[in-house]
């Protein structure tokens, strides 16, 4: 009933109201700023709330009707109540400082990686889930781990040459351009991760949501 009332109000006046977006870190940081700017120009009277959470948290919030739209980096998912659209790949890579000895190696093996200090995302996160699947598939046990809640902190630690990290390539593009970090493909990593827009199946696709989705699609196409 609450959802129906909100839909009715949006239909009456799509130039007023509010929209709540949940986004995981990578799309929130590297995709949404320009999209939100375009949205505010088109709908200046719409209040936007952006919540940065992990992908599992965003899925739960959508199921509970706590947010209108989710934008997440995730592996392909199959949840009947949630409708998803794949908008772009979000490739995980193995990142390290240009001073790290991996930057001088022609080939990095699984055994080489196993001996390094690994910077890990906290649970729950899609990155951590995929990394766990990869380590189990190849019987890898890290000898030294540092668990972090912040991707920015992880990147700063990497710059000092202190360890390696499995990280989104999108998240380190600026550091790569500035020659602060290097990366290689993760050896024998066969898992797929993309950025998806995701919404509850009973959430009406209003003019506001439609414009937002078009802005996201336009951004990913030109980039």
Predicted regions and their residues:
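A late-sequence structural motif
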Residues: 31, 182-223
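Acidic, Gly/Pro-rich loop/turn segments at junctions of secondary structure
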Residues: 42, 53-116, 190
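Hydrophobic hinge/microswitch elements
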Residues: 54-67, 73, 126-183
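Secondary-structure junction motif
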Residues: 102-103, 117-138, 205-213, 223
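Short helix-loop hinge/linker segments at domain boundaries
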Residues: 1-20, 29, 37-45, 79-85, ...
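Central regulatory/effector-binding core of bacterial HTH transcription factors
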Residues: 16-78, 148
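Short loop->beta-strand "edge-of-pocket" segments that line small-molecule binding or catalytic clefts
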Residues: 22, 92, 108-127, 220
